[in-house]
Amino acid sequence: MQRFMMKSKIHRAIVTDANLNYQGSITIDKNLMELADILPNEKVQVLNINNGARFDTYAIEGERGSGTICINGAAARLCQVGDIIIIISYAIMDDEEAKNYKPKVIFVDENNKPVNM
């Protein structure tokens, strides 16, 4: 059996920008993407803690060390600058791999810098 499992998440990131007229996606600081093992164009789920919105999009790299979390395209209607979000990536695993897999959880501070690593 194959299972959809949480691979990683960036927990309680703060939206720094929203660009309604961009084609789509979420721009994430490259450092955070690497720590969370999220590749460019990888599908991610975004959960908005402020308003309960949930949506799927794909990740694109932001400037390394910038703390950028920018919601692009139509999803910009679901988040505002300053909103707290969780960004989750998933992987498909067989039962044995899923039982032993430890997801990466990246906690960030108010500037989207990793903490408690």
From Swiss-Prot:
Gene3D superfamilies: 2.40.40.20
Residues annotated as signal peptide: none
GO cellular component: cytosol
GO terms, biological process: alanine biosynthetic process; pantothenate biosynthetic process
Keyword set, alphabetical order: Autocatalytic cleavage, Cytoplasm, Decarboxylase, Lyase, Pantothenate biosynthesis, Pyruvate, Schiff base, Zymogen
Cofactor: pyruvate
Name of the top EC class for this enzyme: lyase
The organism's place on the tree of life at top rank: Bacteria
EC number(s) per entry: 4.1.1.11
Pathway involvement of the protein, from the record: Cofactor biosynthesis; (R)-pantothenate biosynthesis; beta-alanine from L-aspartate: step 1/1
Molecular functions (GO terms): aspartate 1-decarboxylase activity
Record keyword Cytoplasm present: yes
Family indicated by similarity: Belongs to the PanD family.
Functional description taken from the UniProt entry: Catalyzes the pyruvoyl-dependent decarboxylation of aspartate to produce beta-alanine.
Protein name stated in the entry: Aspartate 1-decarboxylase
Taxonomic lineage: Bacteria, Bacillati, Bacillota, Clostridia, Thermoanaerobacterales
Gene that encodes the chain: panD
